[in-house]
From Swiss-Prot:
The keyword Metal-binding applies. The lineage of its organism: Bacteria, Pseudomonadati, Pseudomonadota, Gammaproteobacteria, Vibrionales. NCBIfam families: moaA. Catalyzes the cyclization of GTP to (8S)-3',8-cyclo-7,8-dihydroguanosine 5'-triphosphate. It is an enzyme of class 4 (lyase). It holds the Pfam family Radical_SAM. GO terms for biological process: Mo-molybdopterin cofactor biosynthetic process. This is GTP 3',8-cyclase. S-adenosyl-L-methionine binds at Y35, G77, S128, M199. Its EC number is 4.1.99.22. GO terms for molecular function: 4 iron, 4 sulfur cluster binding; cyclic pyranopterin monophosphate synthase activity; GTP 3',8'-cyclase activity; GTP binding; metal ion binding; S-adenosyl-L-methionine binding. It comes from the Bacteria. It comes from Vibrio vulnificus (strain YJ016). Keywords: 4Fe-4S, GTP-binding, Iron, Iron-sulfur, Lyase, Metal-binding, Molybdenum cofactor biosynthesis, Nucleotide-binding, S-adenosyl-L-methionine.
């Protein structure tokens, strides 16, 4: 099949173009993070073999690439729990048109495997580190793995990553007062530290009410102390990224409750079971897997995605209390 013309690039009725695919490859996670899976992963009764296989991944990524997608983030659950994770990276990275291959991980396998992931084609990595206090890290994640994760980040730099992105979910009374420690940590390290506001999902209403805190106070502190806002590239995510001449690291803020947060939306999501999600907080998933079984199904796969895109909402409407069907962030890859 010939590559889509620019006019056929994935675009919705609000003229938002989609350069970025978040592809979940598993729902399984070995951590028990308070804000995601506090009781740990609960199997649905289906075998892990029900997750997308390599051939299905190759076909769906090619369809997205043929319509303008240039960045793929491999997510979970914890994606590195897949035994074929390195093969998945290679499959995505080998797809014509894909320029950036990223993953989001809890970091527990990084120290041992980050070199082979990089060799397979991974060129961006995000690691979840919700506290620099090992005891608080344990409390939030349910796992005593802080030093293991830190060693994995160090190893990423050793094998040649120029920058590591670190995700921190902001939570009142848990980690919201750790900004000074985080700033000290990134002063001489090329880390983009990303503070993410706690988001309300179907199973987390009480947690949200107890621990949600806005990132506005952090933003005001940064601006008052000489941090400057960077200009976004087309396929960048929603983070407002700040830089400072005295710091090697950067600070990103992801604040989904901000006005116009969705105006620059550039990503679509495919779940580990092959459903298209137009929004993290959407009210349904659209079956794509039946059109991932043969190479010659690509025109139909693209047509279905294009058609569904025209139903994408202008906003997530979180401010109006609409949290959609997402029970927790692990279910469609965050």
């Amino acid at each position: 099949m010939e590559r889509c013309s620019v006019a056929q690039q994935f675009e919705d009725r609000f003229h938002r173009k989609f350069y970025y695919l978040r592809l979940s490859v598993t729902d399984v996670c070995n951590f028990k993070c308070t804000y995601c899976l506090p009781d740990g992963y609960q199997p649905s009764g289906q075998k892990n073999s029900s997750f997308l296989n390599l051939s299905e991944i190759r076909r769906v990524v090619k369809a997205f690439a043929d319509c303008g997608t240039s960045k793929v983030r491999i997510t979970g659950g914890e994606p590195s729990l897949r035994k074929d994770f390195t093969d998945i990276i290679h499959t995505v990275a080998s797809t014509q048109g894909i320029k950036r291959v990223a993953t989001t991980t809890n970091g527990y396998r990084m120290e041992k495997h980050i070199g082979e992931w990089k060799e397979a084609g991974l060129n961006q990595i995000n690691v979840s580190v919700d506290s620099l206090d090992p005891r608080m890290f344990h409390q939030i994640t349910g796992e005593n793995k802080f030093h293991q994760v830190m060693s994995g980040i160090d190893r990423a730099f050793e094998v040649g990553f120029e920058q590591v992105k670190v995700n921190v979910v902001l939570m009142k009374d848990l980690n919201h007062n750790e900004l000074p420690a985080f700033l000290h940590w990134i002063k001489h390290r090329p880390i983009q530290l990303r503070f993410i506001e706690l988001m309300q999902t179907g199973e987390m209403d009480t947690l949200f009410q107890q621990h949600h805190v806005s990132g506005v106070a952090i933003r005001n502190h940064l601006i008052a102390n000489g941090w400057l806002l960077k200009v976004k590239a087309a396929n960048d995510g929603p983070a407002q990224v700040f830089v400072h001449p005295d710091y090697q690291g950067e600070i990103g803020l992801i604040m989904p409750y901000e006005k116009d947060f969705c105006a620059s939306c550039n990503r679509l999501r495919v779940s580990a079971k092959g459903k298209l999600h137009l929004c993290l907080f959407g009210d349904r998933g659209v079956e794509l897997r039946d059109l991932m079984q043969q190479d010659d199904q690509e025109p139909d796969l693209i047509a279905r995605i294009q058609s569904e895109l025209q139903t994408k909402s202008v906003s997530h409407f979180l401010n109006e209390g609409q949290t959609g069907m997402t029970p927790h962030l692990a279910s469609i890859g965050g």
